[in-house]
Regions:
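Cationic, histidine-enriched alpha-helical/coil surfaces that engage anionic ligands
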Residues: 1-186
Length: 186
């Protein structure tokens, strides 16, 4: 039909985009073994987000079998978001440890009549405690994210999703150059 002819290139482009997001997500997976790689952890979260949102848009075409993939992506995205929050906390607390920052706080406390000797030591102790708490949380979340990726999400993304995309492409009535490339990849 005329409508199918119009939609085919759009669907093929969407399938290529999804594959690109899958490739991007899997490329960041090794960073889950590297605790000191917050920029790639954040990039992996964003890649999961792009893939999830694209799949949500295409859910009517992919059908209910895409639900487990969407659920796994949402859970992973949440874990990675919590990990990112810990990493931001640690960066902010490190900046707060800076002597200039502490001196400024001390001055403001003196102006407020709160004194500074006990306050400075208390603040440093509180910062130290928060840093340790966030480091422990970061380590736990990174371990959980690594486990989740290897035990659940990797399978969903690389096998189930790839299969769903292939099945959807096969339902297209007319073969095209883009569709043949996509099928050859699978």
């Amino acid at each position: 039909s005329q409508q199918e002819l119009v939609l085919l290139p759009l669907w093929e482009e969407a399938a290529e985009k999804i594959q690109m997001y899958i490739d991007e997500l899997t490329a960041y997976a090794p960073s889950l073994q590297q605790p000191q790689d917050p920029s790639n952890h954040h990039a992996m979260r964003i890649a999961a987000k792009k893939l999830r949102y694209s799949l949500e848009i295409l859910e009517p075409l992919l059908g209910s079998p895409v639900q487990p993939v969407l659920q796994a992506l949402e859970e992973f995205q949440s874990l990675m978001g919590q990990l990112h929050d810990c990493q931001v906390w640690l960066m902010e607390l490190e900046a707060l440890q800076d002597r200039k920052q502490l001196q400024e706080i001390r001055k403001q406390w003196q102006k407020a009549g709160l004194g500074c000797g006990w306050a400075s030591k208390s603040l440093q102790a509180a910062i130290g405690w928060l840093q340790e708490d966030r480091r422990l949380a970061q380590a736990k979340l990174l371990e959980e994210a690594g486990w989740f990726w290897h035990e659940r999400l990797e399978e969903e993304v690389t096998n189930r999703l790839a299969s769903l995309i292939q099945k959807a492409l096969l339902r297209c009535p007319w073969p095209s150059e883009g569709r043949q490339r996509q099928l050859a990849r699978g």
